[in-house]
Each structure stands twice: as C-alpha cells, then as structure tokens.
C-alpha cells in the first residue's frame, strides 16, 4: 500500500508539472470519479494510533512515512487542544456540544478526533470537496453537508454549539472571508463557540514557504497588512484561493464592529495552531 500511495501521488505531481492546468484538472476529476468504483482498500488506509482510516486523497498527510504521520496526528491534536481551550474559556465543555460543525473538514484531519469527544451523529462535516464529505460521513458517521463557492447559499440544517474552521480563512480573499464570518456567526446557537484559525503577522516571515509565487511578495504583504489590516494574494491557477494574512487588532476591531454585542472574544492564541496559525474563539452571547 505504501508503494501504491507514493505511486499515485508521484504520478499526480508529475502530471501537474507538465500538463496545462485545465487539462490536469480534467484528468484529476476523471480519476477521482473512477476511484469511487474501486474497493475501499484502494481509497483509504488504516494507520496505528490514528482513529479511522486516512483517505489517499487527504493531502494533509504528505506521505506514509513515520515523520509525516506523526505530524498529521500532532496537527489534529493541536486543533483539539485549542478547541477545548476555547470551550473552557467560554464556560463550556464537550458535554455541552450537542451540534458541531467542522467547516472545511477535508478528509477528517480534525474531525476524526472530534468524533472521539462528540457523538459522530452530532457532527456536521462540510466541505466543497464532495468526495471528502462522503468519506467523513462513511468513515466517521458524521452528517454530510456539501458547501458551495458562495457560502451564503449553503443551507445549514441547524444552529451549532461549536463551529471549527481550521485553515480556511487563511486561503480566502478578504471579502469572501468576511462573507463566511457573517454566515457562520448567523448559525451559532446561544453561547455557541466559533473557533477559527488565520495566518497572523508572524506568517509574514514565512511567505516563501507557501510557494514560489509568494517569495517576492513580502513587501506587498507587509504594506497591505500594515496599512489595510490584511492582505491577500492568489495561488497560480488557484480559482480564487491563495494566502491571506490578517493583523490581529484589525480583525478584532472588524468583528466587534460588525457583530457586537452578539459576539465576544473569549480566547486568542497567536500562532497557537501547530506553532503557525493564530487561533480565535468567539462566543455568541445574544
């Protein structure tokens, strides 16, 4: 299985380097649909110490090597520690969570751990990647919900005591991020917690690690963050996704101006998720 895992990933990366982007997207889409016809053993694999299998399309796991697997687990557990800290800061505990939304759940890097603390049927797995949502529903027992490019058009089945958004605002243009913030704030239950991560000012020093297209953009990012409070640059061919960095005081002031007195900030940790992304926890109080 390790050979298969590496072979599929290697072939995908090789094709991406040589194919025009539109053709690569077409081939990848056809492959992903074809995978649904294969036995489950070809789509996911169990690893020691990890609850549930990891899907072969879960690119949060760089490889099946032990170091990469340990990092995958550590990032998931770091999210859980931050979620628990946010709950406690809001005077809540896991037992108070009767409805949880993992928005941008992917293939369950965090959801698999949430399902250890919350009955899986009380967790909504939401992502624009429908295959990922189906996997989380089948593997962990979560309720599936397909997201849309326009977050405002998503119909949520209920209000939530806990909403977790890990590493999505980090990739959204500023206006789309604000749209999402308004949507998620609107589906919080009374005393519910919205816990999300962003790339804060500390990430200005690591732009080159996000890809070659960002290596020369540090001056523009620093100017935008200092002057406007946030700055975004797209990925090459990224269909509206990219890298966003937010200044802490600007984000806090924006949320308070838009949503007070309904929301209060109960917890903030700079670079709190995996020593990288800032963690924010806001609680609905009205």
Task: Report each predicted region and the residues it spans.
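ABC ATPase nucleotide-binding domain "signature" loop
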Residues: 171
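A short glycine-rich, Lys/Arg-flanked "PGG" loop and its adjoining helix->strand segment in the class I
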Residues: 178-190
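Compositionally biased, charge-rich terminal segments
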Residues: 1-19
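A conserved beta-strand element that flanks and buttresses the S-adenosyl-L-methionine
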Residues: 164
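Class I (Rossmann-like) S-adenosyl-L-methionine-dependent methyltransferase catalytic domain
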Residues: 9, 24-99, 106-155, 174-179, ...
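Local beta-strand N-terminus motif with an aromatic residue
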Residues: 97, 160-161
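Short catalytic micro-motifs in class I SAM-dependent methyltransferases
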Residues: 167-168
């Amino acid at each position: 299985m390790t050979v298969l895992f590496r072979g599929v990933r290697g072939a995908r990366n090789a094709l991406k380097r040589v194919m025009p982007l539109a053709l690569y997207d077409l081939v990848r889409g056809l492959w992903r649909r074809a995978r649904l016809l294969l036995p489950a053993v070809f789509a996911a694999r169990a690893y020691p110490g990890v609850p549930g299998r990891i899907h072969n399309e879960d690119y949060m796991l760089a490889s099946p090597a032990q170091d990469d697997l340990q990092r995958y687990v550590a990032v998931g557990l770091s999210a859980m520690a931050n979620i628990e800290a946010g709950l406690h800061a809001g005077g809540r505990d896991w037992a108070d969570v009767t409805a949880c939304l993992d928005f941008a759940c992917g293939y369950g890097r965090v959801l698999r751990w949430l399902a250890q603390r919350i009955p899986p049927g009380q967790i909504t797995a939401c992502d624009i990647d429908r295959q990922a949502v189906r996997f989380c529903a089948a593997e962990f027992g979560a309720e599936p919900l397909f997201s849309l490019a326009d977050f405002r058009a998503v119909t949520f089945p209920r209000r939530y005591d806990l909403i977790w958004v890990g590493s999505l605002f980090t990739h959204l243009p500023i206006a789309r991020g604000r749209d999402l913030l308004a949507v998620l704030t609107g589906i919080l239950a009374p005393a519910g917690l919205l816990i999300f991560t962003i790339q804060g000012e500390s990430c200005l020093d690591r732009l080159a690690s996000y890809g070659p297209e960002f290596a020369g953009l540090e001056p523009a990012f620093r100017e935008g963050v200092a002057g406007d409070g946030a700055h975004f640059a797209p990925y090459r061919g990224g269909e509206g996704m990219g890298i966003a960095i937010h200044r802490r005081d600007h984000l806090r002031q924006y949320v308070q101006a838009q949503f007070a007195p309904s929301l209060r900030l109960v917890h903030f940790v700079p670079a709190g998720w995996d020593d990288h992304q800032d963690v924010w926890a806001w609680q609905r109080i009205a």
